[in-house]
Amino acid sequence: MKGKFIVIEGIDGCGKTTQINELSKWLPKSGLIKKGSKLITTREPGGSLLGKKLRGLILDNNKTNKPSSLAELLLYSADRAEHISKIISPALNNNDWVISDRFSDSTLAYQGYGRKINLEIIKKVESIVCQGEYPDLTFFLEISPEESIMRRKNEIPDRIESEGIRFLEKVNEGFKLIAREKKWKVISASQNIKTISNQIKETLLNNFSNDK
């Protein structure tokens, strides 16, 4: 039996990293992970060694290095292919749990709804890249674009974060559509950290307690 693959999605500033850190402390003691298995936390882009190099290319804020929308899509896809091959699939086949900060639906939201690349093209690329490796459960931490920008006002933005509120609005609407279509667990990220964390934990217990 394979391990579990959990993904946390949302626009920048929604608290994905914070919640993954909370889960990394709770899950090993929760009783959900089988004895002998472990928890692996990862992210996209940059979850593998090659991915870290690709992340630098993708998020470089130097305007002279800005890739075309199609090149950007393929860079993310290359990162994901390596991520699945080197990190995600080996862990799941070892009965480990994997929690990822973003996965393939971020590409649909950002490159599809944000960049307006044809969604069917993205889905075809992703079907080749993912090779049937999809999350068992996805959480969508939902905040408004305005709150996202406010939370990040003291940070140095990367290239994607520098796109502005109109781009972020399109991405956020994309996430909402995907969340409804795929029946994600949607959680308001405007709540305090503990409340969000408790809702995530409760959902995991409800979904996977019988798999222990």
Swiss-Prot record:
CDD domains: TMPK
GO molecular function: ATP binding; dTMP kinase activity
Catalytic activity entry: dTMP + ATP = dTDP + ADP
Listed GO biological process terms: dTDP biosynthetic process; dTTP biosynthetic process; dUDP biosynthetic process
Keyword Ribosomal protein: no
Pfam families for the chain: Thymidylate_kin
GO CC, one annotated term: cytosol
Protein's UniProt keywords contain ATP-binding: yes
InterPro entries per the UniProt record, alphabetical: P-loop_NTPase, Thymidylate_kin-like_dom, Thymidylate_kin_CS, Thymidylate_kinase
Entry EC no(s): 2.7.4.9
Positions bound to ATP: 10-17
The entry's keywords: ATP-binding, Kinase, Nucleotide biosynthesis, Nucleotide-binding, Transferase
Role description: Phosphorylation of dTMP to form dTDP in both de novo and salvage pathways of dTTP synthesis.
HAMAP family tied to this protein: Thymidylate_kinase
Family: Belongs to the thymidylate kinase family.
Protein name: Thymidylate kinase
Lineage: Bacteria, Bacillati, Cyanobacteriota, Cyanophyceae, Synechococcales
GN (gene name): tmk
